[in-house]
A protein has these predicted regions:
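N-terminal DNA-binding recognition helix of tyrosine site-specific recombinases/integrases
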Residues: 34, 42-52, 59, 69-70, ...
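C-terminal secondary-structure termini that scaffold catalytic or DNA-interacting sites
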Residues: 214-217, 301-311
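Basic, Lys/Arg- and aromatic-enriched nucleic-acid-binding interface segment
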Residues: 84, 88-90, 107, 111-163
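Short, aromatic/basic-rich helix-turn unit that serves as a nucleic-acid recognition element
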Residues: 2-43
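C-terminal catalytic core of Y-nucleophile DNA break-rejoin enzymes
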Residues: 121, 189-208, 216-237
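C-terminal catalytic core of tyrosine-transesterase DNA break-rejoin enzymes
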Residues: 154, 158, 164-165, 237, ...
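Catalytic-site neighborhood detector that most strongly recognizes the C-terminal catalytic loop/helix
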Residues: 126, 188-192, 204, 228, ...
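Short, polar N-cap/turn motifs at the start of nucleic acid-interacting alpha helices
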Residues: 173-180, 245-246, 266-285, 292, ...
């Protein structure tokens, strides 16, 4: 009598199985959209990695070794351009799947034993007021591709919108209250949290400037935003023209908004609401950066008075 051989559980299949649970967590509001998307993206990266290294799209979960995990981490950093924290997040997704397989007795050994993955603390870079003014003062009328990128960047510096949110910002997201104040009301693409942002004169002027732009009219958006990749490439040129040493990116604009708000005494609770943070601790990261800046700004005064003693 011959028994049937049980088909082995496959790594990417198990991953997709756990992603069904992640989707349920997303629907319940237990995790944010960006977390779920990371899990989905991790499966795609695994398939790409296995095709590249083993010429297959999946392997039995029992065949996952410590070496394969190391190779996948290397693939994330070298092939996908992941910084340390992004690579760590993806590898931890795989670790979670392996623990799921271990709990179901599909594997007998955890290949992650002895492995540690540490996220690095990253400082939030932002533009100072003089640096932002230097960007705003650039005359780019003869270089329209840079002008629209500069204007989009400045709009984000005064609203705190992330790239995906400014790209999907519709004219219907801008409202005027009974007192004539203009507001942006938009759910964040990343978390679904509502951002409620008062529009100051600068972003209002920028929105009006592009009101007749063909792309704006056709898509009913506020600004004719190009791709994130192109925008960051053009921001490098803008930084050179403005003689700014910092690495300008679309996300640095969001950090700049938080920093400028803090330095102009806007309460952190209000900043958190405008940024659409679901947890105020996320906003407090900017406050820590601000504390460091304040300390550095006091350096001249400190040098002057440190040696002075009261009689």
């Amino acid at each position: 009598f011959l028994g049937t051989v049980e088909k082995p559980k496959m790594l990417c299949d198990v991953f997709r199985e756990t992603n069904v649970k992640r989707k349920e967590e997303l629907d319940r509001g237990d995790i944010v959209k960006a977390t779920y998307q990371r899990w989905e993206r991790c499966v795609d990266y695994l398939v790409e990695f296995l095709k590249l290294t083993q010429n297959v799209e999946d392997i039995p979960v029992r065949d996952v070794t410590s070496g394969i995990i190391d190779d996948f981490e290397h693939f994330l950093r070298m092939r996908k351009g992941c910084a340390n924290n992004a690579a760590v997040r993806y590898v931890r997704c795989v670790k979670n799947v392996m623990q799921y397989a271990l709990a179901h007795k599909w594997i007998t050994h955890d290949p992650f034993i002895g492995k540690k993955y540490q996220r690095t603390h990253t400082e939030r870079q932002f533009l100072t007021e003089p640096e932002l003014k230097a960007v705003m003062d650039l005359d780019l009328k003869d270089i329209p591709r840079l002008e629209v990128v500069r204007d989009t960047f400045v709009f984000c510096c005064f609203t705190g919108l992330a790239f995906c949110d400014i790209k999907s910002l519709l004219r219907s997201n801008i409202t005027t209250d009974t007192e004539g104040n203009t507001w942006i009301r938009k759910a964040r693409e990343k978390t679904g949290e509502m951002s409620i942002i008062p529009m100051l004169a600068v972003p209002r002027h920028i929105a009006e400037k592009y009101a007749t732009n063909p792309v704006v009219i056709q898509k009913d958006v506020v600004l004719p935003v190009i791709t994130n990749q192109k925008m960051n490439a053009y921001l490098k040129e803008i930084a050179d023209l403005a003689r700014i040493e910092k690495h300008l990116t679309t996300h640095l604009a969001r950090h700049t908004f938080a920093s400028l708000s803090l330095s102009n005494h806007v309460p952190i609770e209000s900043i958190s609401k405008m940024l659409g943070h679901s947890d105020i601790r996320t906003t407090q990261i900017y406050a820590k950066t601000q504390d460091k800046t304040v300390y550095e700004d006091m350096a001249t005064m400190r040098r002057k008075f440190d040696c002075v003693m009261i009689n």
